[in-house]
Amino acid sequence: DALLYVANWPEPRRYPWSQLLIARAIENQSYVIGVNRVGMDGKGHHYTGDSASVDPRGDADVMKASKEDVLHTVLHREALDDFRAKFPVAMDADDFGLML
């Protein structure tokens, strides 16, 4: 399982962007791919990229900043299944419903 986030986070928000990618990977026990823009927009906001691939443990195995580039990463299904088997948080889920 993998989550893909395409974003537009400017340079002053680099830290929250990276931390949110890590948090999403951990809480969902999934790989997370975060793709953020680079360069300058029409209002003068600077974007540093900081695109990343994060594993379910929260380790960023690829991170790029400041320039347009192509990232390559390999996601390992067996490693994901093994991690989930050893740390089965999904077993704590409760059935619930939303009444609108």
Predicted feature descriptions by range:
Residues 1-71:
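CN hydrolase (nitrilase-like) catalytic-core segments centered on the catalytic cysteine
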Residues 42, 60-61, 80-82, 90:
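A broad, structure-centric signal for solvent-exposed, well-ordered loop/edge residues
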Residues 69-86:
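A short, polar/charged loop-to-alpha-helix boundary motif
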Residues 81-100:
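Cysteine/selenocysteine-centered motifs that mediate thiol-based redox chemistry or coordinate metal-sulfur cofactors
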